[in-house]
């Protein structure tokens, strides 16, 4: 773990001011300032490319940082100089998986000279010290500087994604597929399916979604062939085949949040969504550092991975 003492020794110059920001752990008193910095960073990028903002308001950004700080499975640090916060990053842990996820990473647009790189390197070092061999993130291609940074740090592009928005097409039910709410008794079958598709189970997220009653399963011939923790940015789905994904989307109680990510390489699914009234919002890329298991079935990633 990066301590404040280590952080003070890990200084990087700011390209515009010549200042030397330091890194330290995020404290409750930092939440509002970190949230405002995150909002401005995302607003600037979205406005430059005419994309809908990922952070729709300052209050949203402050709430996001506050929730991350309260999460026992999240670790966050910030960069500051002379009391001004220049950026922050979180490393998100997923119990029962070999994966950690970096994000959100935000850097003040006025801060240059390696602030983002130092924050990213600290997060990667933290993952390494925790024995985590797979680190992932979802990157917006509109931000070319961050893409170059991630590549330099060893990340590989694994899946081009498209955020889509729409309503569940209830009239497009898939023949032979039955969608229902997931129950605790379904968990083991779902976990085995996730291992088949991704190489590991995401049991913590799955069981939390079942408790919150957002998880659904799809059955064919009385056998579970896929599941979703939710259809939305915060949920993910794992299935044997694309038709199972279509069924989960068509049978979803609602689309949670602004939409969900679709792997662009799954052309059959993307065409089906567009034919059923979904519209594209913005592109993104799933990137990974370390080991990676190429999915063997069909899936929808969350905003994390």
Give names to the regions the model predicted.
Residues 1-21, 28, 69-70, 74-76, ...:
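Intrinsically disordered, low-complexity, positively biased terminal segments
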Residues 2-64, 158-161, 170-201:
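Short amphipathic alpha-helix that is part of the acyltransferase structural core
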Residues 147-171:
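Short, structured interface segments
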Residues 15, 24-127, 131-132:
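Active-site-proximal cofactor/substrate-binding loop regions of enzyme domains
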């Amino acid at each position: 773990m990066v301590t404040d003492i280590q952080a003070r020794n890990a200084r990087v110059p700011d390209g515009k001011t010549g200042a030397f920001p330091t890194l330290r752990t995020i404290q409750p008193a930092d939440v509002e300032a970190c949230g405002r910095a995150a909002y401005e960073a995302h607003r600037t990028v979205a406005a430059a490319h005419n994309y809908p903002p990922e952070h729709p308001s300052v209050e949203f950004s402050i709430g996001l940082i506050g929730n991350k700080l309260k999460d026992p499975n999240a670790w966050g640090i910030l960069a500051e100089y002379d009391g001004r916060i220049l950026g922050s990053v979180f490393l998100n842990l997923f119990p029962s998986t070999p994966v950690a996820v970096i994000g959100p990473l935000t850097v003040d647009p006025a801060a240059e000279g390696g602030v983002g790189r130092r924050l990213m390197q600290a997060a990667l070092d933290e993952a390494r010290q925790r024995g985590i061999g797979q680190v992932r993130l979802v990157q917006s291609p509109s931000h070319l500087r961050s893409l170059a940074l991630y590549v330099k740090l060893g990340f590989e592009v694994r899946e081009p994604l498209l955020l889509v928005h729409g309503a569940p097409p209830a009239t497009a039910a898939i023949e032979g597929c039955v969608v229902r709410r997931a129950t605790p008794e379904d968990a083991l079958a779902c976990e085995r399916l996730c291992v088949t598709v991704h190489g590991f189970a995401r049991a913590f997220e799955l069981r939390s979604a079942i408790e919150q009653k957002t998880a659904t399963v799809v059955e064919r011939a009385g056998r579970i062939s896929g599941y979703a923790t939710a259809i939305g940015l915060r949920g993910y789905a794992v299935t044997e085949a694309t038709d199972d994904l279509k069924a989960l989307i068509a049978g979803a109680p609602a689309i949670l949040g602004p939409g969900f990510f679709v792997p662009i390489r799954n052309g059959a699914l993307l065409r089906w969504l567009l034919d059923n009234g979904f519209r594209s919002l913005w592109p993104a890329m799933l990137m990974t550092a370390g080991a990676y298991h190429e999915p063997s079935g069909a899936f929808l990633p969350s905003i994390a991975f």
